[in-house]
């Protein structure tokens, strides 16, 4: 928000679409960014578009002293591969959102579109020495550079 406000105040520049990229999420593709922008350009009713990783696991949250299964509307007990996926939000990899959303103090608006992606490196999000070590191993041993995979 600070950068958007600064551009408006100091450069009299207002962008229709703001792209958010988290520096700790290294292994994104250029198409992730392009796809998020393209979705907003083609769908003016949308507030935000971001990449999300489909997952077929069961998720639970603690509610007081008990645990509640999330997405309880998805049948339980079927093989994971046959289940309707949930989507893990990956806005750090690629998010495009509208100016008004950012100015309201949020990254995501109410009306969002998720671009599904599967990337074996998406779990790498640098927040510890171990995360940095994993990233360095991928770069040195697999010759995969940040923002290219």
Residue locations for each model-derived region?
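Helix-loop-strand module that forms the ligand-binding subsite of alpha/beta enzymes
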Residues: 23
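Hydrophobic helical membrane-anchoring modules
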Residues: 115-149
């Amino acid at each position: 928000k600070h950068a958007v406000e600064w551009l408006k105040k100091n450069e009299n520049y207002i962008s229709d679409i703001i792209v958010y990229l988290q520096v700790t999420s290294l292994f994104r593709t250029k198409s992730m960014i392009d796809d998020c922008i393209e979705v907003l350009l083609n769908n003016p009713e949308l507030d935000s578009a971001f990449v999300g990783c489909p997952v077929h696991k069961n998720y639970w949250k603690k509610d007081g002293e008990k645990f509640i299964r999330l997405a309880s509307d998805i049948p339980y007990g079927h093989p994971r591969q046959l289940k309707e996926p949930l989507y893990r939000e990956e806005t750090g990899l690629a998010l495009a959102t509208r100016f008004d959303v950012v100015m309201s103090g949020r990254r995501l608006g109410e009306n969002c579109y998720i671009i599904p992606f599967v990337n074996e490196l998406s779990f790498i999000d640098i927040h510890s020495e171990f995360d940095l070590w994993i990233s360095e191993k991928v770069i040195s041993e697999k010759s995969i550079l940040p923002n290219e995979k």
